[in-house]
Structures are given as structure tokens and as C-alpha cells.
């Protein structure tokens, strides 16, 4: 039998009055005896402190403070300690004979709060010879010792071999160790458990009936049916988990779509961007290479353009220089043409003026003759008029004389006046102031003679004038001609000069005749010279373009060579066109083929992805469509086999579930009907009675009872006989055994035990041999063991079933995948790799592009050579006909020579043209120049003077004649009028006068008209002379201007000048055109160079930027690739089919996915933030982080109890497989897990019955307990009425409330709480939740009401209350209750602690003086019967007869307070020896 653990001793170190005191504890009762203040309570306080070191619970008060809530501030502990380190230690021996020392180190904490610091510790493996005081003290001398600190204690124990020291930071750990080693009876897991234990100790210490315990006896006495509760909790948890799993499945079904949506959209979003970046990286690399190629090409082009620019600039400079000279030549030619035209116009004017002058000269000569004739006629008219005037005057005078004669006085007076007038006129005219009428006659003769002489002289001079005038006009004309030709000269030199001019004129005329031939010759030579110069220019240009100087003799050979080269290049160009066409056709075919392959590549890649997925899923590699179809047939066969095996495993699992369900019935009833029959018969199942049988005894009892192990034990068989009639709802064999269920044993059979078998003698003639079953199920332990093994088997079967179901689903899905693959991709999956073909074709395309580029360069060079050759041939075609000109080196000299001769001839022609008419006129009259009639003017003057003298003499003679004629009239001064002697004469005179006057009038009119005509003729002559002079001056001016022009104006001069100007204009135009072309070309070249420079800068910038971008992108791409590879998502993101989409398509795909993702992650803050961060186009790695975050988020949302993978994509596939199977399995599991309300009621009832039976057995132990008038103590256990109603409803009327228990929204606990509220609406549930209430209703303790009853005197059984009992009776009754509690705790803890440990039992009783001797004897008897230790504190007048007694006396010695302790054994004869602690009776322990 297992020995119970005991407390050996209590050690106090440095307590108030106890420096180092060890109290050896008795195995039953230890009594502390002493007066007030002796230290009894301090000793028990030290014990309690070591047992429960919880400052929140410890409160040591005396009886006067009982019930007080505010005692001393230190709660009684601080004042019981001395300053410094204090210890309280318990030395124990457990059932395993292990010595364990547990205790606490206490130390006062300085301050107003009077706190105490407590450190629990434990010592194991301490030898029996070592006393606790030796451990914690160090002897300094004979009378002094020092208390060790906890660290020093630890170091001291570490030096001892085999001793273990443990210090605890948690009271729970301290109590856990004490429970495991059997020091305390209950595992104190929480502060609530410690509080219960402390309340029990406190109730024991202060005695009496503790209201704190009696109010909660259920918590102290009734064990927490943790198994049932755990079963309920597990069932509910399983149901909850099942429902949560079902809900999770439903959520997962939606999550599946979310998974698909998230994965699809996230993959599209990230993969599109990933592939776009991959494509862009490739494109950027290609662009960088293209930029570099273009950069090199542009540099070459720029260099070529620079060379071309230099050549064109040089040529442009040459043309600019040539243009200046050509412009000067052209301007000179234009000016020369203008001069020639001006000279021609001048020449025309000169000729016109000369013709006009000749005409004017002729008209002038004619007019001179007309004027001369008119002058002569005027003179005649004047003479005639004078004669008529004279005749009229004479007639008038005659008529006057006649009338005077008739009238002497009048007439003579008139005559006299007239005579006087005539005399005065004669004096004036004749310049004779002394002239008198008498001398008039003489002077008349003189003057008449003078007149005659003047007339003769005038006639002579007139004759001379006529001859001189003819000679003078010829000489003057000839002289003027000579002066006009030669210029001013002396008149004497005119003859010689005229002859020289006539000779020179002949020569000049001969030279002038040679102008036209010379001009034609010069024009021809100049044309040849220009052609020679053009040929030289062409040759120089040809040599310049050819880059080599050629001799004239080499040109024909070069022409033939170029002709041959042109023919060869023409063939080459023609062949090049065909070759280029062939290359381009091949390139187009390649491009078309590549486009076709690029269109087919995504389909092929999709087929390959599907094929790879199939290969990964099935672990096979397929190389042909036939292998795929063959494997599909194998899949079908495998699916059939897996279905068969799954069905077999499912059947076995169902059988195991049924067996587990059968074995899980309450009370071990495999048939539910047995519980009903047991309740009906008022019996107990035999299996329930033996429910606590150990696993070792289970085979024996199973064989012992055999088929009757499911019997019902009834108190009286005779009472149920009638109930058996008509019983149908029962098993086929129903065994009934008569017996007391409370004290049933196996004595009903006669049994012989054999080896692993029994022989049961049922009757004299009937034996039964039963072997021990290999798997016994009799008793709870055996059933639990069997259920455990069945659960293990079920787990294996479930796992196998799940595996097989998964395999079947997987196989079916694989079959579907193969079917889809065959339907969609089989036709293209095993074709050649289009990407490999694309790579090969791209390589070939690159080769073709390179060949085309090379061909284009060669063709360009050939075309350039061809064009150069054609230009060379064209230039040579222009040059070859002019080779003779190029070879003619004297052409320029001949041109100069002819030019000189032409200049002379043109000079002669100009001389002839200018002076030819004068020379022609000079030639017939040149002879007149031999003598110069220079007296002509003098003669002309003499003639005029003679003519005037003759006129004056005539007038003088006439005036003198008139005076002479009127000489007689001078004498009539005194006379009268003379009368006429004949009237007829007067008449005749009058007639003649009228005729004379008429004649005079006519003469006057004729004179007047002739004078006007003469005046007109003179005016015409004057105008002609003026016109002649003017035109002569103009002619001279024109001739001078012509001479000033200095240009020979012949008939061909203008044509030659115009031809020269046009040639120069053509050359200038060509030069300008070429210059403009060069300028344009140069401008274009400069623009091209600028463009190339800008392009080059841009290319360099773009190349460097692209290179930097490529390098940066490479770093970013490396980071992206590293992140992709580290997270294992490359296979998800590198979707090769996306490589064939454009960047816009990929961006559109990514943007669409982004929009969908924004909606999908709108409720997820983390993914929303990561998604927002991933939208940065400059940080592509953030999209990978988002993808990883999505995968991580989906991994976290994957229920590992449903899906066995971390990959969300595989999770989707497994979801499809698992969801339907799990739904079915969990639905059936829920049906199996769901416990019926009847079963719950039965379980609670059975538990209540069992605990009632246990309480009755505890009551049997208290029946003999008596204290004073109390004869017996018992516990009364009743079921509450409201809860009994609940059990009845659960058992009999559960169908009425299935709306609660069949609801998937309510757990069983919540449904139970709802039912309780429905049945008891009057009860206020407060703020508690239905789940809390339901859990309380699942605890059977809440169904029971417990109260303590005592049998006291004549009152009989009544409720134990302090007011109804004496103090001693209350203490005894309370102690009895505490003993029941401790025993109940041990029974409850037996399942938790090892089977080989029986815990220590110890209670306290302070102030035991209230008990009488009989009551104390009862306590001693109770302790002995229950193997319990008891510490009693009693006054000095209490001396128990048994146990150990310590006498405590507090003394003061030398100002030092200490407690004197004397220990004695009990007075009973069986314990005569004195305890070791009593030997120091006279030697007090003193504190140093």
C-alpha cells in the first residue's frame, strides 16, 4: 500500500522570538501550547507562509479581527519578522520516500508600507543527516550565528553533491512542484485555486464553520468534471471548428474566386509589367545597339559630309572667284554692247544728221539763190518803186507847178517851201551846209559825176564779186572739208593736207573693206578660242573630278576604258538589282514566316504550358500525342482502382466511427437503449459500476462477466418482473443482475482464474470459459484505450481516405486536364518549337540585313562609280571633238593678230564712215585749195561800200537835182499864184498822176509783198542756216561723243557684242546656277551636317541615356530578378507568350488588371498600400513586392487543414479537388459530432448520480464524528428545480426545441442557454452571454445545491450554522467539512498526479481551548483514521494525550526577546520516548 507523505518539520529562521528553530511535526497531531503571545500564531503563520507564499492572500489576524476587512497594515506578517533575512522552511517526505525541503526567504522592505519580500525555493536530494537550520545559518562562535542570504544558500547547496536547489519566480511554478511531489493535495493552477486553498487553511486555522467555504462547497467538494467538460468543449470546439471549417469552405469557395481573381489579375498586372520591362530591356538593348550603330554611321556620314563640304566649299570658292570675273566680263560685255548700241545709235544719228546736213546744205544753197534772186528782184522793185515814186512826185510837182501857175501865190509858196525843204535835204545828204541854190548846179554836176563813177565802180565790183564768190565758196567748202577731217589748220596747209587725206582715205577705204572678212575671221577664231577655253575648263574639271591629271593623248584610251567600265558596271548594277530583289524577297518571306511563327508561338507556348503542367502533375514526359492518349487510358484505369480503394477505406472508416460512437456512450453502454432501460428499472449499468476499473483489470472483468458485461444491476429483480412483460425496445439479450449498485462486487459468480482466462460456474451444470480479450472494452480506461486506438486508426483511415479522395479528385481533374489538352492543344503541342525557328530565322534575317546593307553599300559604290564613269564619258564626249583645239597652241596669238588687224580695219572703217563723204566732196574741189581767195571778203566789203556810195551819190544827186530843179522856186518867195495856161494839161497831169500813183501803189505793193517774201526767204535762209549750224554742231558733238565712246560701230559689232554678252551671260548663268547649286548643296550639306551634328549629339545623348538606362535598368532588373528568384515566382511572371504583345497591349493589360486589383484589395489596407506603392513606374521591383505580398496574403489565408500547400496557384487546384470532398466529409462529421440533448441530459444525470454516491460515501466517514451535542455531520446534495426541469426537457421534450439545437448559427452551449432562458423567463441572466450561460449549464456542479447538516441533540438533522452551534461544535463541524474537502481534492487530483504518490494531509487549529477533551479525542481519531496531520495551538491548560506537544514560553533576556520551546511526546503508553527536540528543554534558543 502506498504510504502517505508527511511533513517532517517546520523551521523558522530570524522570526520574531525564533532565531533558528525547527519544530519536528508529529505524524498525527502537533500541539503548540503556551500562553498569550508565546508565539503559537507566529509558528503557524510561518507554516502557512511557506505553504502559500502569496502576499495578496496572507492575512494573519487574531480572533478579534475575524471578519474584519482592514486589520493591521502589514496583514500580520511584517511584525512577525526580524530585520534581515528570514526563512520559513518545510521538510517533507513524500510517498516515494523523497526528502523535499520547500520554503520561502522573507525580508522586510524599508518604507512606510511595511512590505515583505518573499522568494519561494525548493531543495531536493538533501541527505537525512542535514538539518534545515544547518543550511541557512553559519556558526560564528559558540553563541553567535549568521543567517545566509538566498544566493549564499544557493552557492552552499551547489557545493553539495546530489542536492538540487530551485528558486521560483512564480508561485504557480512553486505550487506545481509541490503538487507533483505530493506536498499539497490539489494543483493550484491559478490565483483562484490558491485563494480556495488559502481559504481552506484559514478556515482550518481560525476554526468554526467558514461561510466562505460553505457558500461554495460545490467548488471545494465537487470535482470539476474536466473530462466531461473537456469532452463537451472538444465536441463544441470540434463542431465549431467543423462549422468554421464548413464556413471556411464556403468562404474558401468564394476565396477560390478571389484567389483566382487576385492571382489572375495580380499575375496579369505584374507579369505584364514584368514582361514589358523584359521586352523594354531587350528593346532598350536593341535601341542602344541601334543607337551605337547609328552613332558610328552618323559619324561616318558626318565625316563624309565634312569632306563633301570641304570639296563643295572649295568649288564654291572657285565659282565665286570665277563669278566675279565673269560678272566683270559680263558687265564689260553688257557695257560694250550698250556702247556698241549707243555708238550705232550715234552713228545712225550722225548719218541721219549728215544726210540732213547735206539736205540742208542743198536747201541752203537753193535758198541762197532764191534769196539772191529775191534781193535782185527787191532791188528792181525798189528801183521801180522809186521810179514810180519819182514819177508820182514829178507828176505831183508838175501838177503842183501847174496849179501853182494857176495860183501863183499858193503854188509859189508851196514851191518855195518845197524848194527850201529840198535844199535842206540836199545839204544834209550832200554834207554841204553852204549849199545854195545857185551853187547847186555846180554841185549837181559834181555829184552826178560821182554817182556815175560810183555806178561804174559798183558794176565792176559786182562783176568781180560774181567771179570771186564762186571761187570763194569752192575754197571754203574744200577748206571746211579738210578742217572737218583733219581739224583746225592753216589755210596755206590746206592743199597739202587735203592731198595727204585723199591718199590716206584710199588706204583707209581699202582697210575698211577688210573689216567684215576680218570680223568673220576673228569671230571664228574667238569662237574656237572660247571652245578651246571651254575644253580646257572641261578638261580641268574632268581631271579634278577624276582626281588625276590626264594628257590629251590619254583621253581617247580613257574614254574607251570608261566605256568598258560603264558596260561592266551596268551589268553589275542590273545583276545587283536582281540580287537585291532576291534578297528582299527572301527577307520578306522570312518576315512573313516570322510573323506567322510569332502568331503561332503564343498558341504553342500555351500548349507547352499546358503540357508542362500535365507533365508536372503526372510526373511523366510526353514526346508525342500517342503517349498522351496512352497515359489518358492509364489514368482512367488508375482512377477506377483509386475509387475502389477509397470506397473500401471509407467503409472501414465508417465502421470505426460507429465503433467509436458505440464505445463513447455514457456509462459504457454500447446500446443507447440500455441507458433508457436502466433509468426505467431504476438500476445502474454494470459497465457504469465498473467504469473506474483499471486498464490492467479490464481483461479479467471483461472475461468474468462475458456477455453479461452489459447487464443492468437492479436492487430487486422481483420489482421489475412485471416491467419485462411486453418489453420490445431492448437488445436481443438483456441481462439483469440483482445487487446494490453502491456496494456491488463480483461475488455473484463462482470463478476459477486460469492463465489469461477464467472459468465461470454459472450453475452446477453450466460453466463458461472466457479468455481475456486482447482488446478489452470493459471499464472507462479500457474503452478510452480502445477509443484512443480507434481514433488513431481512424486518423490513419481518414488520412488515407483523404489521400485517396484527393488522389481520385486529382486523377479526375488530371483526366479533365488531359481531355482539355487533347481538345485544345494536342494538334500544336508536339510541333517544332516556333521560338527556336524564330531565333534561327531572326539570325538569318540579321544575316540578310547585313548582306543587304553590304549589297547596298557595294551597289551604292558601284552606282557612284557608274555615275562617275558616265560623267567622265559625258565629259570626254564633249572633250574628244575638241582635242585639236586643245592641241592648237597658236590660236590665241592668231586671235590677237586678227584682233589687231580688225582694230585697224575698224579704225579705218570708222574713219571712212566718218569722213568718207567729206573726202568724196573734197576730191573734185581739192584743186581750188591751191590758191586761197582770201580778198573775197574785202571785195565783198568794197562791193557793199561801193553799193552804198552809189546809193548815197544817187540820193545826193537826186537831192541836188531837186534843188536845181527848184532853183527858180527860190525866187517865188514874194510871188502869187501862178495860173495854168491849159486846163487839158492839168487833166492829163491828173490822169498821169493817178496812173503814176496807181503804179506807185502797185510798185509799193509789189515791193511790200516782195519785201515780205524776201523777208520770208531771208527767214527761211536764216532758219536753214540756224538749222544747219545747229545740226552741224550736233553732228560735231555726236562725232565727238562717238570718238569719246571709242567703239567701232559697224554692222556686225552689235551682233558680236550681243553674242559675247550672251556667251558670258550663259557662262555667268551656268556659274551662278552651279554656284546656287553648290550653295544650296552647301547649305543642304551644312544643314545636313548640322542635322547630323544635332543628330550625333542627340544620338550620343540618347545613346548615353539609353546606356545609362540600360545599366540602371540592368541593376534594377537584377534586383527584380533576384527578388523574383528569391521568392520563386519567376515561373509565374515569366510568361513567354506575353513577349509577343506590344508595350501598349501589355500596359493596357497591366492597367486593366490594376483597376480590377484596386477593387479587389480595397478592403485590405496592407495590399492596398503595397498596390499603391507598386504603381510607381520607376520602381518595378515594387510590383514584384506586391505580387509576393499577394502570394503571402493568399498563403496566410490558405487553411492548412483544408489545403496542404503554400502555393496559392496549387491551392486553387487543390481547392477544386478538396472543397466538395471536405464539404461532404465535414457535413457527415458534424452529424456524428453533434451530440443529442438526450445524451447531454444522461451524461449530466449520470455525473450527478456519481457525485451523489461519492458524497454519500464521504458522509459515511463523518457519521461517527461528534462534537458536544453534535452526534453526526453530513452533506446534503440536491438538484435545483430549474435545472431538473431543464434535464427533463432535454430528455423527454427535446423535439419541441429542435429549432435551437438544429441551428447552425448556435453552438450547443448557446442553444442550451437559450432553452434555459425559454424555460425560466423569470430569471435575470444579467450581462452574461448565452455562451457563458451554456458553459455553466454544461457543468453538473451548477445543477446541485449542497449544504452541511448536523444531527444535534433532540433537534435532529438541521442546517449547520454558526449561530445554532456552540463554538466547539462549530469548530469540530468545520474541521469535519475541511477533512471532506481535502479528501475530495485528493480524489480529484488522483487522475492528475502519479499513482505512486499519496499527498500530505495537514490542517491547523488555532485556539483549540474551545474544544473539550472528547472533541479533541474525536479529532485525534479522525486524523488517525484519515492519516492526517494536525497542528493545534492551545493554551497551557490543554495537554493532549496523543501526539507531540511543544510548550512555548516567550522570555526577555538581556533586552533580547526569545521563545523558550520544550517538546514532549503524548501521554499514551505507545509513545513513551521523548522527541529529539525536547532534549534542549532547559537550553533556550537565543537570537544573537
UniProtKB/Swiss-Prot annotation:
Subcellular location: Cytoplasm, Nucleoid
Gene Ontology CC, one term: cytoplasm
Binding site for ATP: 34-41
GO MF term (any one): ATP binding
Record's keyword terms, sorted: ATP-binding, Cell cycle, Cell division, Chromosome partition, Coiled coil, Cytoplasm, DNA condensation, DNA-binding, Nucleotide-binding
Coiled coil: 326-418, 444-472, 509-602, 835-923, 977-1116, 1209-1265
Annotated GO biological process: cell division; chromosome condensation; chromosome segregation; DNA replication
Composition-biased stretches (Basic and acidic residues): 1051-1065
Transmembrane segments: none
Subunit field text: Homodimerization via its hinge domain. Binds to DNA via its C-terminal region. Interacts, and probably forms a ternary complex, with MukE and MukF via its C-terminal region. The complex formation is stimulated by calcium or magnesium. Interacts with tubulin-related protein FtsZ.
Entry function: Plays a central role in chromosome condensation, segregation and cell cycle progression. Functions as a homodimer, which is essential for chromosome partition. Involved in negative DNA supercoiling in vivo, and by this means organize and compact chromosomes. May achieve or facilitate chromosome segregation by condensation DNA from both sides of a centrally located replisome during cell division.
Entry domain remark: The hinge domain, which separates the large intramolecular coiled coil regions, allows the homodimerization, forming a V-shaped homodimer.
Protein name: Chromosome partition protein MukB
Source taxonomy: Bacteria, Pseudomonadati, Pseudomonadota, Gammaproteobacteria, Enterobacterales
Gene: mukB
